[in-house]
Regions:
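Flexible, acidic/Gly-rich N-terminal and inter-domain linker regions that tether
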Residues: 1-126, 130-175, 337
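Flexible inter-domain linker/hinge segments
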Residues: 41, 45-77, 187, 191-193, ...
């Protein structure tokens, strides 16, 4: 018996429950066996092999203790991104790279692109390999948010869309279904449940019929390539649509219950620092916009983009890094409590960026360090997520924010600490322009726990009933304040069973519940 197998069995037999206990048992075993102390990655791999061979019983707590890169599941779920095949896009955007053999707007060298290329852009293989990788690192994969990226999703053939999504579900289900509907039904109780599904598309492709189709696929969030909300800047950059399409798409999506993410691009041709700052103020001042999430991608100057010629002829000049950091600080200080900045900057290899601050790939890290040094705070959801800072002793408070958005009313409910620096759980409730009630999001943050966790040092807001309490409050608001008799939820396929236990029933693609008097 080698040192790895011996150590794993010793850890299980002693019932190790804490990081300190893990380290102590490892040292003790290696000293007794006269071997150097094994690393956690090797131990985790050996543990999985022993479980597979049925030499040891599954011990979830040990998986957590041996977990590598814990940040991957500190938001309460795990994210998996899959890339579509290269396909034309109707857009002719000035800044967009046009690399052969790659979905438009993406470039070789980006991690997701390289993984997809190695697997021939196969959705099943991409989903399967990422799931296996997360499991091998000790992360639970029973709650997955799947993100489909690459080009303009709505422009791909419908047959390809159906096949692509079905194969993602097949990979999570561990079996091949006859059709998409069957694959979704299987996923409701599968080991790896897709509780959220998002796609990228253009605002001018969002129509009532497209929304119905997106729901049939199981989508719960749409990433809109907005980039700018100013007509002249959209026109200069050859976006092919205007502000009215952005406003309409946002309204249609929110009324249908979708979470709406705006991809925004500071430093576009035609803009400047003052305009960019003003734009982010307008995003949350004007009810026509009010996105739930943001991805802020400073314009990257790439040789394969038409913008390259502008730069060569000195018609375009990127911001300096110092200018961008100052701008980003101003933006972050203006973000409301109900918005999550999902990402800042792309994973584009720095050698491909010819000039400008987009060469810096760790912009968010720079901003976080600046925030800490200067003593200011960003109110966005990501900066306030509880992550691994949870303490059972700290008192949790219910907060509520009402705001107008897209001809409707949004009610943002959240459980936070008193100073609102730690966010535990949130719910987005909407009264639509047609006076209907829909829950657009429920999310509890903190270390992701399996659906049937073991007790031990693993303390997390998960499985504490916070989500259920928020749902109960949302139902009370709908019934007592808004006088509505029915509430619906835009549930991910893998989350349907959760809502069934709360009295909700599947109606078309939504979970619905009648509120009795």
């Amino acid at each position: 018996m080698d040192i790895l197998e011996t150590t794993v069995k010793e850890l299980i037999n002693t019932g190790v429950e804490t990081p300190e206990g893990l380290a102590k048992t490892k040292r003790k075993t290696s000293k007794r066996q006269k071997f150097s102390c094994p690393d956690n990655i090797s131990l985790l791999k050996t543990y999985h092999e022993l479980v597979k061979k049925k030499k040891v019983k599954k011990y979830p707590l040990l998986e957590f203790l041996l977990q590598t890169r814990p940040v991957r599941s500190l938001s309460g779920i795990v994210n998996i991104s899959v890339l579509t095949k290269p396909y034309p896009c109707p857009g002719k955007c000035l800044y967009c790279p046009q690399e052969s053999g790659i979905p438009k707007s993406y470039v070789s060298g980006e991690p997701a692109v390289e993984r997809a290329k190695a697997l021939h852009f196969d959705p099943y293989l991409q989903t399967k390999s990422r799931t296996k990788m997360l499991e091998s690192e000790g992360h639970p994969t029973d709650k997955i948010e799947l993100r489909i990226v690459g080009g303009t999703w709505s422009y791909y053939p419908r047959s390809y869309q159906n096949w692509f999504v079905k194969r993602c579900f097949d990979a999570c289900n561990g079996k091949t279904a006859k059709n998409l509907k069957e694959a979704q039904k299987i996923n409701e109780n599968a080991k790896n449940r897709i509780i959220g599904l998002s796609m990228e598309t253009r605002p001018d492709f969002i129509t009532p019929s497209e929304i119905k189709r997106l729901r049939k696929l199981g989508a719960t969030m749409i990433e809109l390539g907005v980039q700018s909300i100013y007509e002249n800047i959209l026109r200069i950059n050859l976006r092919g649509h205007g502000t009215k399409e952005i406003i309409l798409a946002t309204k249609l999506l929110k009324d249908a219950g979708f979470k709406v993410l705006y991809q925004m691009m500071p430093n576009l041709p035609g803009s400047n620092l003052k305009k960019d700052e003003k734009m982010f103020v307008e995003l949350f001042k004007n009810p026509d916009f009010q996105p739930d999430l943001l991805k802020i991608y400073p314009c990257a100057l790439l040789k394969s983009a038409p913008l390259y010629k502008w730069w060569k002829s000195k018609k375009y000049k990127p911001y300096s890094l110092e200018q961008l950091i100052k701008l980003m600080k101003k933006i972050k200080l203006k973000i409301p409590y109900f918005v999550r900045i999902q990402r800042i900057s792309r994973d584009i290899p720095s050698q491909l960026v010819l000039a400008g601050p987009a060469k810096v790939s760790n912009l968010r890290q720079i901003l976080m360090e600046k925030m800490k040094k200067e003593g200011w705070r960003c109110r966005c959801i990501r900066c306030r997520e509880i992550r691994d800072r949870y303490s059972q002793k700290e008192k949790i408070h219910l907060f509520r924010e009402d705001y107008a958005a897209s001809e409707g009313k949004e009610i943002f409910l959240s459980f936070e600490n008193e100073t609102r620096s730690k966010l535990y759980s949130l719910l987005r409730l909407r009264r639509s322009s047609e006076n209907r009630a829909i829950i657009r999001e429920i999310h509890t943050y903190g270390r992701q726990l399996p659906l049937a966790p073991t007790s031990g040092f693993l303390v997390s807001p998960q499985h504490k009933g916070l989500g259920k309490k928020l749902i109960k409050e949302a139902e009370r608001i709908m019934k007592m304040e808004l006088k509505l008799k029915k509430i619906t939820v835009i549930s991910g396929v893998g989350a349907r069973e959760y809502y069934r236990k709360l009295g909700y029933k599947l109606e078309n693609t939504y979970m619905a519940k009648s509120l009795k008097n």
